[in-house]
């Protein structure tokens, strides 16, 4: 009977290990680093090509800029209007009215170093160009000389700085009867509102197709492409590339897939065009940051576009052609999100400002039905407690409470099986080596006593999707980035930095990298605690009598310790808390059923055998 208990525990442990090994295969651990702008790099970034309004009109010619050595030089090439709020700073270029300079003031590039903020957008002509352009494509009798393009220099009508309380107004006259106006606003977070109006002073009706595009040069995309390629044998846990909402469904296109789309000779690029309703949006998303075009109240074509010659990746929103009668003025409004993927912020835009399913821009993964409520609960707990580490522990307590009825039945079943140990010994004496008779008698005893020997595996099996979902939450949650816990844990999104090599955090030395020979010695304190708590949990039951089983059982905690040592410390904290609560639950339930676990005896049983 005791062997049955131990077999159940071993089976559960082996299943967990197989799941972890599968996880490592399909979701290899990546040393995820944001793409830093190399201030000394030389680039030949070109300005994005405006789309055509129809197949009958060619796209605007490729417009290139003078090669610049640094981001700062590229910024100085054009006249600018400052952008300033409590959360972002940067500028927009009067050339093309491009939003191409943006830093996120709440986020540092390095932990505890406020001197360098995360740079989201950078100008064309500099390294790692990443910018947003809005405009009109000509239709009918018009051509690109009649509309403002990426190199058009706008004049300032009003406003010399863009803030949440002060919009800016721009103007451009084509000197042929058309005057283009632009009003740009920003809220207190990351949402821009772009209002474009056209005054038709000609004697003819005109047709124009509004568009917005987000353009990135290769370095940003190739960094993500490299991560996707490094895991091409499996499935990378994080989507990076285009994310779009068609109004009815969410679609994703990886950076690595964009060059594989059908080639368009007219646009000299690889294209994928998806029809979207007036509830849709499209943009680029990464692990923590996102830029998104949101055409308001207008159906549009969502476009994924890759230009090999220019090494440029684009996401476009091509709106329906509008007609402006002679003597009339018409306005088109759209929004732009450019900022951090903060759960509370993007949920607000979705719930309160009508951006459909905007919260789904966070990559929830295959267990989204578990991940989403877990994500929401974790953030609620963090808002109440004020610390993500303690919020993870509180979440673990809630999960254990929800699963307690199953755990109770499981542990009661295990306790009752211990009570049947004397009867099992009698059956062994009675049937001897007749395994078939022994098995039949054992199953009859289980049925009579209403004991399920497999019940001990159920709580472990239920934890598998929970483990995957929590890992997903911790991996993609921006709020865990640079979030401290206690002691040496300053960033819950990365592995425990303590190790034997730095005397567990007492010395200011970094742990070796994942490819180092000494990585085996870089197991931190929290992974060690995880191994110890798992080992203690085992000691609630005597070791198996079978030597092979006993050896597997003995090594299991320490194998798990090394396997999970490279995971985010937030996940290891969950595992330690889960092991501790499971130990308390099992010990209490076993005592309530009249079974007194001999923990110390099980710990030192091996040594006693050696003495004898």
What residues fall within each predicted segment?
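Intrinsically disordered, low-complexity regulatory regions of eukaryotic regulatory proteins
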Residues: 1-2, 42, 54, 67, ...
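Intrinsic low-complexity, intrinsically disordered segments enriched in polar/basic residues
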Residues: 5, 27, 38-40, 59-70, ...
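Intrinsic disorder/low-complexity detector
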Residues: 10, 40-42, 46-47, 57-58, ...
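Soluble non-transmembrane domains of integral membrane proteins
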Residues: 80, 84-357
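Helix-loop-helix
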Residues: 1-46, 92, 196-197, 209-225, ...
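General structural signal for secondary-structure boundaries
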Residues: 66-77, 84, 254, 259-262, ...
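Juxtamembrane extramembrane loops of integral membrane proteins
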Residues: 25-121, 607-612
């Amino acid at each position: 009977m005791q062997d049955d208990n131990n077999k159940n525990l071993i089976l559960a442990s082996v299943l967990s290990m197989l799941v972890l090994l599968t996880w490592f295969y399909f979701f290899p651990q990546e040393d995820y680093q944001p793409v830093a702008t190399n201030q000394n790099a030389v680039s030949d970034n070109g300005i994005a090509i405006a789309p055509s309004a129809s197949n009958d009109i060619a796209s605007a010619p490729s417009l290139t800029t003078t090669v610049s050595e640094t981001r700062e030089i590229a910024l100085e090439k054009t006249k600018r209007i400052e952008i300033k709020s409590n959360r972002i700073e940067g500028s927009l270029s009067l050339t093309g009215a491009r939003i191409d300079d943006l830093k996120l003031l709440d986020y540092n590039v390095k932990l505890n170093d406020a001197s360098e903020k995360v740079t989201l957008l950078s100008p064309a002509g500099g390294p790692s160009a990443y910018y947003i352009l809005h405009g009109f494509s000509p239709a009918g009798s018009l051509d690109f000389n009649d509309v403002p393009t990426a190199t058009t220099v706008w004049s300032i009508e009003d406003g010399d700085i863009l803030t949440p309380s002060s919009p800016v107004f721009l103007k451009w006259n084509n000197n042929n009867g058309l005057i283009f106006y632009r009003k740009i606003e920003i809220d207190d977070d990351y949402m821009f509102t772009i209002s474009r109006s056209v005054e038709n002073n000609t004697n003819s009706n005109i047709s124009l197709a509004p568009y917005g595009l987000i353009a990135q040069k290769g370095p940003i995309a190739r960094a993500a492409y490299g991560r996707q390629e490094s895991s091409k044998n499996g499935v990378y846990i994080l989507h990076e590339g285009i994310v779009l909402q068609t109004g009815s469904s969410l679609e994703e296109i990886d950076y690595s897939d964009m060059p594989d789309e059908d080639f368009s000779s007219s646009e000299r690029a690889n294209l994928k065009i998806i029809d979207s309703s007036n509830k849709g949006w499209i943009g680029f998303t990464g692990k923590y940051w996102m830029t998104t075009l949101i055409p308001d109240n207008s159906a549009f074509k969502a476009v994924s576009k890759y230009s090999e010659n220019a090494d440029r990746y684009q996401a476009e929103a091509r709106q329906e052609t509008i007609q402006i009668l002679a003597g009339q003025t018409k306005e088109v409004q759209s929004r732009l999100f450019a900022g951090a993927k903060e759960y509370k912020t993007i949920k607000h835009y979705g719930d309160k400002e009508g951006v459909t399913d905007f919260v789904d821009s966070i990559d929830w993964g295959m267990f989204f039905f578990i991940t989403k409520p877990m994500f929401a609960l974790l953030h609620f707990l963090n808002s109440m407690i004020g610390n993500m580490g303690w919020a993870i522990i509180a979440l673990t307590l809630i999960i254990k409470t929800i699963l307690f009825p199953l755990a109770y039945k499981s542990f009661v079943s295990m306790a009752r099986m211990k009570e049947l140990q004397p009867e099992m010994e009698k059956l062994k004496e009675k049937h001897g080596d007749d395994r078939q008779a022994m098995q039949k008698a054992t199953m009859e005893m289980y049925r009579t006593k209403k004991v399920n020997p497999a019940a001990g595996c159920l709580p472990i099996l239920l934890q598998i999707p929970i483990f995957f979902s929590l890992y997903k939450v911790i991996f993609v949650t921006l709020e865990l980035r640079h979030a401290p816990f206690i002691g040496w844990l300053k960033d819950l999104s990365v592995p425990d930095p303590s190790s034997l090599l730095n005397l567990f955090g007492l010395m200011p030395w970094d742990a070796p990298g994942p490819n180092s020979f000494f990585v085996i010695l870089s197991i931190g304190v929290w992974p060690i605690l995880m191994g110890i708590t798992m080992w203690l949990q085992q000691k609630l039951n005597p070791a198996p009598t079978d030597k092979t089983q006993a050896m597997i059982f003995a090594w299991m905690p320490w194998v798990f310790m090394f396997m999970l040592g490279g995971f985010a410390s937030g996940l290891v904290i969950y595992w330690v808390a889960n092991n501790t609560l499971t130990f308390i639950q099992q010990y209490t339930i076993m005592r309530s059923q009249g079974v007194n676990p001999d923990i110390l005896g099980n710990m030192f049983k091996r040594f006693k055998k050696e003495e004898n």
